[in-house]
Amino acid sequence: MNTDTLMTKKDSKQMKYLQQAVRLLEKKGYREIKAELPDYESPTSFTERSSDKSYTPDLTGQKDFGKDYFQVVEGDKKNVQDVVSKWKLFANLAKIKNGQFYLLVPYGRKKYTTELLREYNIEAELMKLER
């Protein structure tokens, strides 16, 4: 399997998770949903000052009086520091915007997710995604 095929397969799986998450947010009464999907406005990117790296949440949405941030857990064990930086940034942004940070956890990634949250003291709620 070549790299392009692997990327396409990963992208289509990510797209499926994002579509599933958008449906879930709509059912829960979120408004102003932004997602990296056709027919949706893209979420705003944020740059971490200490590293100059730019991060974009997978989804954002307004509910009640706050803005919530959502990220699909990819299980990236090679770039743990990037993952941790991204999650910490989104958790802090959610707090500033009177919202919450949610990690959308696909089947098989719960242990990885809970270990990172505990080890790096990151505040996030978990939402399970279907297979």
Where in the sequence are the language-model features?
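Hydrophobic beta-strand segments of well-ordered beta-sheets in folded domains
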Residues: 66-70, 98-103
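Active-site metal-binding core of divalent-cation-utilizing nuclease and nuclease-like domains
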Residues: 2-15, 27, 32-67
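Anion (oxyanion) recognition and catalysis
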Residues: 26, 95, 118
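Arginine/glycine-rich "motif VI" loop of SF2 helicases in the C-terminal RecA-like domain
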Residues: 91-98
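Domain-level recognition of nuclease-like catalytic cores that cleave nucleotide substrates
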Residues: 103-131
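Well-ordered, non-membrane alpha-helical segments in soluble/globular domains
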Residues: 14-21, 81-89
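Structural motif
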Residues: 37-38, 72-76, 104-107
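Conserved catalytic cores of phosphodiester-cleaving nucleases, focusing on short active-site segments
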Residues: 57-86
